[in-house]
């Protein structure tokens, strides 16, 4: 099988295309490690600041233990045209009360299921990117974004 030939891409467009894709895709996949076993699941970010992604979770969920043991994670965003953004990063717990309240106020789903920002089960992770890559269609080549 030959390698697909994607449309030509101006390198100066890559950062904006990557940001647009992150804004468009509602449910990226989050990869963590469970010991030596990779785990992958869809997540619904509760806030996005460029390539900094915030994910809410419950402390009782498996990914909480996985992230506690290994903070290295990767998010993969893919649209219907198979364009991808991969954000490799470090997950850190958000303790900033003002930021938590902003996230809470903007997310009715959190409010509905958890009742209060002070719910002891709530944990919010900030994914600090260490690497961001973009792939156009099925080109099989990534462009470095960050």
Residue ranges and their predicted role:
Residues 2-10, 84-146:
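Charged, gly/pro-rich active-site loop segments
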Residues 29, 52-54, 74, 86, ...:
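General beta-strand recognition
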Residues 46-80:
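A short mixed-secondary-structure module that forms the rim of ligand-binding clefts
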Residues 25, 70, 107:
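Acidic-histidine catalytic/liganding microenvironments
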Residues 1-27:
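Extreme N-terminal tail/first-helix region
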Residues 42-44:
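Conserved beta-strand in the GNAT
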Residues 37:
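Phosphate-coordination/substrate-recognition cap region in phosphate-metabolizing enzymes
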